[in-house]
Amino acid sequence: MSTSTPLPSTPTGKHAIVYGGSTAGLIAAGVLSRHFERVTLVERDRLENGSQLRKGVPQGAHVHGLLTPGMNVLCEVFPGFREELKAAGSHFIDFTGEHAWFMGGFWRPRIPCGLHFYAQSRPLLEWVIRQRLQALPNVHVRDGREVTGFLTSPDKARVTGVHLRVPGGGQEETLEAELVVDASGRGSRTPQWLEALGFPRVEETHIQVDVVYASRLFRRPPGLVADWKMMSIGPKLPTERRMAVLAPIENDQMLLLLAGWHGLQPPLDDAGYVGSTRELIQPHIHEVIQNAEPLGPINVFRYSHNQRRHYERMSRFPEGLAPVGDAFCSFNPIYGQGMTTGALQAQALSECLRQGLGGLASRYRRQVGQLLESPWTMATSGDLRFPQVEGKRPPAFALMSWYSDRLQALVGHDEEALNTFVRVMQMVEPTTALFSPGMVLKVLTSRPTAAAMERRPEPPFAPTAAAKNQAA
């Protein structure tokens, strides 16, 4: 294991608490270990040794990709993390060079972009992070405990700790801290607890998506010689409501995710699940998995709505409290930005702590509010294309939808435009990069080439001798 993160020479504070052992919570705890003499991570689930699914992560059996900015944060907090994750079995996939990606009616050009999708199971990623975190001498993990409320100063202007207990009852105890980080996910009770303390109820934006995910593990088929590592087949919005992702994970396994919107649920029986891949707009995933060996059950996850809590808009908010990850903002997972956004929030918290604890809550909320704008806009703009989705469309939404369709066609054949699009998707550049004068000109004037229309991946399996003879 690589050398642990150096301890702070001049700590910002004595004790910080993170509650919620999500990836955002684990990263936040690692970040705080550099700023506080002592950090306590509280997690409701019992944390077992090894990479195992947790009850508190219902989406844990599905495709979880970490994007390049998220990996960069992890490597900053835990030096050598990239190498450790690779050694554990993660696949590092160039997002355009090694990713066969069909979207908007076109196969995207296959050119290296230097930005990666880090593919592994969610339990493996959590396990590797947790090992590094637990190696830090100033981090203590309290698993099998749930937080039931906040401790506050007499004037309720500052959160000073938490109440916690064993789930289901038992003796309650208190932990005091100078900073409490809520990483408890989209079901966070912070809005209710703040309201009970006399603070205004946080404004929330919900955008319904009603998407169902069904995922299953398969053994990598023998003889697979595909010229790609990962494949995504996405819908052409808003007329298509089905998509699929096939990604490699550890132990020579492949994870297939099928998704359907607004009542189009993937079949959950063995034959129906595999058979439904024939209905995808492209045949390649079906060709790979039709005879592949399944390695477990079909896991289902229903996601009802995007959810954003606008803590940055609150006129009054206690010091000593910072929500991160899904507790702040939860995106439709199909866009793959959730874990990376959580990591960037933890990084923002670290940057704000460099200025001390005074005024931290305001600085942090403002910075995260700005950070979320780009990924939130990208995720919700796609979801709002479906007429079934309830939610306020921004002004000129019809014009933006038209522009988006033209942009999708452009990145299907223009390598420079594709590179910009991916940099925005990976949160390296803001969404405004898609509206630069040069990009707008291309969107308005460019037309797909014949080569782009004919582009497709190579067959995933080498032809048999019989097939070669027949072709001859």
Predicted features and spans:
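N-terminal FAD cofactor-binding segment of flavoenzymes
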Residues: 31, 51-99
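N-terminal Rossmann-like FAD-binding beta1-loop-alpha1 element of flavoenzymes
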Residues: 7-42
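C-terminal helical "tail/cap" subdomain of flavin- and related membrane-associated enzymes
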Residues: 350-472
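Helix-loop-beta segment of a Rossmann-like dinucleotide-binding subdomain
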Residues: 103-122, 159-161, 258-261
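FAD/FMN-dependent oxidoreductases across multiple families
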Residues: 119, 252, 264-375
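Residues in the short beta-alpha loop(s) of Rossmann-like NAD(P)-binding domains
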Residues: 45
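Predominantly flavin-linked oxidoreductase catalytic cores and closely associated redox partners
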Residues: 135-276
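Short beta-strand to alpha-helix junction loop
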Residues: 65-66, 112-131, 183, 189, ...
